């Protein structure tokens, strides 16, 4: 039977069964093929949509995956990556044993070659190197680069081990690269993280506007829902795509707006100006007066580059861009947009507030209106038109039509965005601007209306953000810098007072810079690929390989970071372990372990717990110097008073305590399912102590979950209990009295809003205790703070140029991103034969006019070169992505087209998120 006949047979068999008709023998082939399969629900491994899938196993291997028809997110659909969840675990070069660089004697040697070693030898060397650095440099000399792909229990264990055990806040996720600007936007505007809306908005809205979000490829299941909504009422429902190049998302759009890089800042202000100056009657005055305040902040904040503009590690070609961190000469456009500060084109702006980039203060509506004045249609079109071949008047019509859609009375509008917004030198600003427009119109936190940040990774929300795996965060939106938050955390973790450090560690990009500077000498990488995914990669690879440090990479495959490492730990993949993810609409989903890990691979939780066994309280809870200004006190005496011994290990105190052991290994949820951490498994892996690992004997995942959820209950982040999630297809938090929340801050739907303002429609309770000084557009005039009392903030943020723009020597913009078929750096998907065949290499998408000028033809190889590095890539002039003249697009999934060697490591100064979307390059034939 061939594939087509099998599918026909399966369909016919299902139809007969539903009709109560006996299945003929000729139609039973599909049923026979599935004989002995066990199906169970799980979450997709890939993007932040959070699709539910069904996983089939037989004989200890995953044999099939399909969309879960009961999953409310995807309703049985999968995208092309989703259908290959089963195959990501079975690549030919899967790492199955620990690998250590050794010399001829079998001893660790940084210049040695990888050799298979035991888990015991791996941990022996890892422990020795960790102790060496910890003793030399203190808690912040060691670091963890984590992930928005951590399961929630993994992220929680990592935070507890690093911050509670080693007293180090130097743990940061790769979500710093993708969602930090959205996070800071939420925190600055709402005082609490994550979207107010949910995916139900798609079916309820009249208008979908995508800003820097190629949803057709990056969130294809959501785009299927958008397409369905559009087709259900094509005349009423409008779709707009705003991007710096044409994408598949434009295929459905009524309006496509190709804008110049960074000019989204100007476009948002134009829309706000249209509202305030030309349609003041459309301002929802009741909403704005009751629920909002107007704010502004400094503009002289730099670009997130190194503060030392003459740093010895910079190449001469990098110095011009590096200098902008200290000051820059204002352009003609900036002379207009910053005129409210008394500045003009040609002035030098000194970046004096880089260290206070997040500062802001309350202003009046009149000041806000004054700042919007320059953003006329003519000015904005001149700044924002991104396609040189487009007629300026046609572009103006599009901008006006865009504004009209937002402004139209009774029109519901959802604004979606992803990396085009977040990976931006003013990423926090542009997130704030989206809320600005929605607030002015009263179109936020309503069914079918709202500004909605889409998450890129499967648990950037559920783990990186909610758990707090950022250097400055703790669970449930708490921060290490707040003494009260540290106190709450110490009590929940049963730590002595003063254990936690109040000093944030090095964020993702700074950790790489600190590695290059010798300030960090031990990094443990988990569930991501930093040496491929971090911009200006040549610097960081050289630092890792040529300097005195030790890099541990937990990975299933030999990606770039694994190749850079000193020690590789083989890690279990998603369905080889128990886990949970949290998606972009605050939906939390759990799954069971379906199969045993390959070879001797072990789950990340196991790796962390085994490492924690090697450190006693006396090793890490004594007096510890963080930096020249901060020394952590010894808490050993306080620990003794709590019943601990200085001989207790971190494992004993943090993970195998009395509370943990209450969670039985005989839990019925585990019946007929493996749990490697709890029981060990039939592989009889020889563990980190040289003995067979037979399990911890208690339900570690359930313990971690139930302890973690205590942080959010009663604080607006309520999660359900462990058992509930195994019965349902996910729930959107806050989950109060067993009921999920669709729209936050709306008293009709959100119990926390209802509690905060029982007689009102809205309450932005994240700001219930917040207060701001007052001033004007130029700064603070009165330091006395005015309470916000459940109000959100409407920010004014000006247009500013990026720090590096095309020039005579580097005449093209470079933008990077993903493609539908591959995930991030391709570590998993490039090993799936079907996905590899579909897209075997990253291409350089270019406009035909540019190719003609360069004498380049379709499929020819070119060099893409910046001030930082260069790579070869094959030119595509006819593909899915269609850049305007002057811009090229190169995805980052292909390690053989290592585009992050070319990209600039500038970041948003507030969020510290890298801007991968704009730098200057030159193109020439290879």
Curated annotation (Swiss-Prot):
GO terms for molecular function: 4 iron, 4 sulfur cluster binding; electron transfer activity; iron ion binding; molybdenum ion binding; molybdopterin cofactor binding; nitrate reductase (cytochrome) activity. Predicted to be exported by the Tat system. The position of the signal peptide cleavage has not been experimentally proven. It catalyses: 2 Fe(II)-[cytochrome] + nitrate + 2 H(+) = 2 Fe(III)-[cytochrome] + nitrite + H2O. Its cofactor is [4Fe-4S] cluster; Mo-bis(molybdopterin guanine dinucleotide). Mo-bis(molybdopterin guanine dinucleotide) binds at residues 81, 149, 174, 178, 211-218, 419, 423, 529, 554-555, 577, 604, 816-825, 900, 917. Residues 37-93 form the 4Fe-4S Mo/W bis-MGD-type domain. It is found in: Periplasm. Binds 1 [4Fe-4S] cluster. Binds 1 molybdenum-bis(molybdopterin guanine dinucleotide) (Mo-bis-MGD) cofactor per subunit. Substrate binds at residue 892. One of its GO terms (cellular component) is nitrate reductase complex. Component of the periplasmic nitrate reductase NapAB complex composed of NapA and NapB. Catalytic subunit of the periplasmic nitrate reductase complex NapAB. Receives electrons from NapB and catalyzes the reduction of nitrate to nitrite. NCBIfam families: NAPA, PRK13532.1, TAT_signal_seq. This is Periplasmic nitrate reductase. The lineage of its organism: Bacteria, Pseudomonadati, Campylobacterota, Epsilonproteobacteria, Campylobacterales.
């Amino acid at each position: 039977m061939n594939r087509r006949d099998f599918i026909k047979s399966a369909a016919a068999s299902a139809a007969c069964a539903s009709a109560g008709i006996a299945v003929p023998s000729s139609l039973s082939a599909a049923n026979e093929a599935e004989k002995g399969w066990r199906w169970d629900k799980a979450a997709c491994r890939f993007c932040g949509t959070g699709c539910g899938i069904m996983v089939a196993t037989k004989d200890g291997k995953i044999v099939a995956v399909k969309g879960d028809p009961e999953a409310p997110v995807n309703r049985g659909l999968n995208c092309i990556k989703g259908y290959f969840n089963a195959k990501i675990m079975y690549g030919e070069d899967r790492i199955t044993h620990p690998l250590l660089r050794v010399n001829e004697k079998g001893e660790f040697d940084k210049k040695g070659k990888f050799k298979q070693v035991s888990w015991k030898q791996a941990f022996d060397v890892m422990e020795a190197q960790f102790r060496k650095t910890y003793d030399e440099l203190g808690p912040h000399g060691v670091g963890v680069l984590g992930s928005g792909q951590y399961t929630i229990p993994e992220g929680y264990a990592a935070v507890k081990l690093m911050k509670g055990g080693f007293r180090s806040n130097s743990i940061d996720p790769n979500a710093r690269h993708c969602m930090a600007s959205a996070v800071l936007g939420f925190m600055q505007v709402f005082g609490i993280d994550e979207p107010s809306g949910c995916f139900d908005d798609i079916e309820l809205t009249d208008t979908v506007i995508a800003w820097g979000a190629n949803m057709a490829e990056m969130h294809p299941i959501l785009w299927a829902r958008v397409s369905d909504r559009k087709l259900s009422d094509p005349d009423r429902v409008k779709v707009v795509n705003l991007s710096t190049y044409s994408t598949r998302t434009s295929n459905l759009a009524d309006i496509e707006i190709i804008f110049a890089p960074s000019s989204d800042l100007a476009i948002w202000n134009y829309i706000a100006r249209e509202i305030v100056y030309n349609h003041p009657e459309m301002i929802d005055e009741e909403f704005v007066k009751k629920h909002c305040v107007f704010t502004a902040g400094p503009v002289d904040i730099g670009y997130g580059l190194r503060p030392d503009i003459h740093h010895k590690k910079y190449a001469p070609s990098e110095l011009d861009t590096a200098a902008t961190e200290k000051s820059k000469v204002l352009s003609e456009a900036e002379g207009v947009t910053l005129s409210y500060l008394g500045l003009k084109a040609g002035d030098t702006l000194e970046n004096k507030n880089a260290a206070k980039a997040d500062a802001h203060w309350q202003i009046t509506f009149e000041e806000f209106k004054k700042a919007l004045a320059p953003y006329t249609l003519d000015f904005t079109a001149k700044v924002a038109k991104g396609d040189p071949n487009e007629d300026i008047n046609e572009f103006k019509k599009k901008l006006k039509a865009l504004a009209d859609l937002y402004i139209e009375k009774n029109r519901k509008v959802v604004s979606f965005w992803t990396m085009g917004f977040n990976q931006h030198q003013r990423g926090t600003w542009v997130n704030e601007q989206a809320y600005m427009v929605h607030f002015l119109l009263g179109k936020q936190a309503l069914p079918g209306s709202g500004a909605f940040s889409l998450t890129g990774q499967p648990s950037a929300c559920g783990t990186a953000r909610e758990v707090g795996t950022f250097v400055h965060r703790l669970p449930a939106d708490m921060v290490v810098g707040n003494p009260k938050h540290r106190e709450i955390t110490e009590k929940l973790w049963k730590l002595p007072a003063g254990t936690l450090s109040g000093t944030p560690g090095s964020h993702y990009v700074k950790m790489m810079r600190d590695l290059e500077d010798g300030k960090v000498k031990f990094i443990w990488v988990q569930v991501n690929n930093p040496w491929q995914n971090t911009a200006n990669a040549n610097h960081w690879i050289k630092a890792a390989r040529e300097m005195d440090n030790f890099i541990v990479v937990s990975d299933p495959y030999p990606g770039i970071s694994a190749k850079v490492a000193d020690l590789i730990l083989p890690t279990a993949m998603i369905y080889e372990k128990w886990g949970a993810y949290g998606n972009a609409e605050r939906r939390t989903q759990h799954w069971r372990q379906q199969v045993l890990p390959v070879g001797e691979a072990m789950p990340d939780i196991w790796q962390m717990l085994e490492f924690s066994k090697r450190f006693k309280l006396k090793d890490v809870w004594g007096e510890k110097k963080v930096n020249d200004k901060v020394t952590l006190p010894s808490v050993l005496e306080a620990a003794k008073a709590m019943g601990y011994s200085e001989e207790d290990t971190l494992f004993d105190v943090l993970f195998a305590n009395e509370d943990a052991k209450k969670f039985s290994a005989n839990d019925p949820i585990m019946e007929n399912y493996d749990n490697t951490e709890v029981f060990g498994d039939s592989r009889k892996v020889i563990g980190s102590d040289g003995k067979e690992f037979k399990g911890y004997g208690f339900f570690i995942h359930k313990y971690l979950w139930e302890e973690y959820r205590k942080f959010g209950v009663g604080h607006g982040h309520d999660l359900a209990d462990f058992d509930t999630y195994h019965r349902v297809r996910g729930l959107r938090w806050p989950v109060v009295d067993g009921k999920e929340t669709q729209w936050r801050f709306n008293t009709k739907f959100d119990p926390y809003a209802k509690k905060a303002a029982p007689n009102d429609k809205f309450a932005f309770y994240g700001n219930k205790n917040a207060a701001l000084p007052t001033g004007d557009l130029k700064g603070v005039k009165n330091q006395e703070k005015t309470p916000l009392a459940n109000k959100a903030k409407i920010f004014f943020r000006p247009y500013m140029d990026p720090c590096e723009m095309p020039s005579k020597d580097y005449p093209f913009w470079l933008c990077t991103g993903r493609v539908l078929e591959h995930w991030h750096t391709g570590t998993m998907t490039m090993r799936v034969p079907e996905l590899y065949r579909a897209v075997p290499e990253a291409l350089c998408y270019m406009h035909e006019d540019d190719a003609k000028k360069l004498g380049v033809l379709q499929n020819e190889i070119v060099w893409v070169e910046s001030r930082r590095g260069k790579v070869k890539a094959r030119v595509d002039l006819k593909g899915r992505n269609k850049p305007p003249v002057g811009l090229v697009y190169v995805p980052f999934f292909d390690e053989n087209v290592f585009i992050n060697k070319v990209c600039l490591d500038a970041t948003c100064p507030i969020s510290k998120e890298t801007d991968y979307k704009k730098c200057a390059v030159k193109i020439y034939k290879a």
